[in-house]
């Protein structure tokens, strides 16, 4: 394959695939993206939209590999929001330009000193009560401001799609449609005289990577799924709140992680994660709702929760397999290893929404380190496929 049609075929239209397509296109790479269903319809639109700098991974009272791997990401995203760098997010409004952490004052213990330490300077700030956000004005406790912020994931996907929409298609790919060789990849489409050729295959399909790894005979890396059981809350008294509650935590994870969203009915919806979601995977929906009410009464006692409407949402976080199924610290990019197709293939999981820029950086470096023949044309390649459409947030029909 001396002159392929494409530099790369990207599989998966969530945050990883769309960010990567924008990044590579801005560098002059000729790529298309294939999405099996709707853009962002897996994990991206079910995420809380937090762009965070790792403080929640340091709640044990010390910096960790996870907290430092992600520390620069808020600045990376703000660069994109300013229209600078390889991915242009200018014009995208954020849901909240600051995130907060709150706790009953007596429950922080040694974290009080850690939060005030030089190691966290510029990343967390204790606030005076007049500076508390509207959602915590009635809170009698300690509030910190973080450098983190929150994006509207639907608006984010729409902004990422805008400059590359002529390169994004819907196709539920099977292993039989792809054939790899030392020279690259061939994608066989119905009613086409010849296959579409590409130098590389970039798998960014989240949970969809798992079946593709098997279909392509790729032995390493492998995938793991870590489940969550999130909670959606509607209540007429809700004010916008974007905050971690760490009152009385006994392990380094927020008790509740709260984001606020338009519920599609003219009101505000709270979306709850944190320990509630990770511990809740073994609870039924009714048990999780009962437990969530107890946690809300404990953490947000100034609201009468008796009239709240609660629903739950189960999500699987797709990641590279880790020892004992633990949480990976960094975005993951690795060349495929196996006895199936020998074509150049990178397996990608951002592991967190915030780390999408880092994933794209890693892929761009890998491509630069292993140059391949330039495509026959630098014009957008029109495929005989329908366009992939953006998905919906999971509460839009709830």
What are these regions (language model features)?
Residues 25-46:
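Glycine-rich FAD pyrophosphate-binding loop
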Residues 300-398:
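C-terminal catalytic lobe of FAD-dependent flavoproteins
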């Amino acid at each position: 394959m001396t002159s392929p049609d494409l530099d790369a075929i990207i599989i998966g239209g969530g945050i990883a695939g769309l960010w990567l397509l924008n990044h590579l296109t801005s560098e002059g790479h000729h790529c298309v993206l294939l999405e099996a269903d709707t853009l962002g319809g897996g994990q991206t639109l079910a995420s809380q939209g937090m762009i965070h700098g790792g403080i929640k991974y340091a709640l044990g009272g010390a910096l960790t590999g996870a907290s430092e791997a992600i520390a620069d990401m808020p600045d990376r995203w703000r660069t994109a929001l300013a229209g600078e760098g390889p991915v242009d997010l200018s014009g995208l409004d954020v849901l909240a330009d600051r995130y907060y952490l709150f706790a009953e004052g007596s429950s922080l213990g040694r974290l009080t000193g850690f939060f005030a330490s030089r190691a966290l300077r510029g990343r967390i700030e204790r606030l005076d009560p007049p500076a508390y956000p509207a959602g915590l004005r009635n809170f009698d406790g300690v509030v910190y401001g973080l450098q983190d912020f929150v994006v509207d994931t639907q608006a984010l996907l729409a902004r990422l799609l805008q400059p590359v929409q002529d390169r994004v298609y819907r196709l539920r790919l099977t292993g039989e449609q792809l054939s790899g060789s030392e020279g690259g990849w061939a994608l066989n489409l119905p009613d086409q005289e010849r296959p579409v050729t590409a130098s590389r295959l970039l798998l960014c399909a989240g949970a969809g990577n798992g079946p593709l790894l098997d279909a392509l005979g790729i032995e390493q890396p492998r995938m793991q799924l870590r489940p969550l059981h999130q909670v959606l809350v509607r209540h007429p008294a809700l004010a916008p709140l974007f905050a971690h509650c760490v009152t009385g935590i006994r392990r380094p994870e927020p008790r509740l992680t709260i984001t606020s969203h338009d519920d599609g009915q003219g009101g505000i919806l709270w979306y709850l994660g944190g320990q509630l979601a990770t511990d809740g995977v073994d609870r039924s929906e009714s048990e999780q709702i009962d437990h969530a009410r107890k946690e809300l009464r404990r953490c947000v006692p100034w609201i009468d929760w008796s009239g709240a409407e609660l629903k739950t949402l189960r999500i699987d976080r797709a990641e590279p397999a880790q020892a004992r199924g633990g949480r990976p610290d960094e975005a993951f990019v690795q060349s495929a290893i196996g006895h199936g197709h020998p074509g150049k293939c990178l397996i990608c999981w951002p592991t967190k929404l915030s780390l999408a820029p880092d994933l794209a950086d890693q892929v761009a470096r890998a491509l630069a380190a292993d140059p391949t023949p330039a495509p026959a044309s630098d014009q957008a390649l029109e495929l005989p496929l329908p366009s992939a459409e953006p998905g919906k947030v999971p509460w839009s029909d709830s």
